């Protein structure tokens, strides 16, 4: 999971050193966040083709979804300088809220 302490430490390091080690930072980005977004985009495109979602741009939809379900938790973990993450119940509540907002925007009417 992206908010595990070891992953947070690696993300902080790579972000901090991206200017000095751009190839390493890019490799991480392409291997983790970018791959996840590409997978989500493919899923959303498929759901759009089946008439289940209204998706004009699957890549934008993937970014919206990822930030809605993870953005608040990840920002808190990254900026607070602590490896303490939210409780599982809080993470689930935020993810559920993100899914509701996503479906409100993308559900086929």
Provide a role label for each language-model segment.
Residues 10-12, 26, 55, 76, ...:
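Generic structural "secondary-structure junction" signal
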């Amino acid at each position: 999971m992206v908010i595990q302490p070891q992953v947070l430490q690696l993300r902080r390091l790579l972000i901090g050193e991206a200017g000095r080690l751009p190839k390493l930072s890019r490799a991480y980005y392409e291997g983790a966040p970018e791959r996840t977004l590409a997978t989500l985009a493919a899923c959303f495109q498929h759901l759009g083709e089946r008439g289940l979602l209204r998706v004009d741009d699957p890549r934008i939809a993937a970014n919206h979804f990822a930030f809605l379900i993870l953005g608040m938790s990840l920002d808190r973990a990254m900026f607070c300088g602590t490896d303490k993450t939210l409780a599982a119940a809080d993470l689930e509540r935020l993810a559920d809220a993100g899914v509701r907002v996503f479906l409100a925007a993308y559900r086929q009417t």
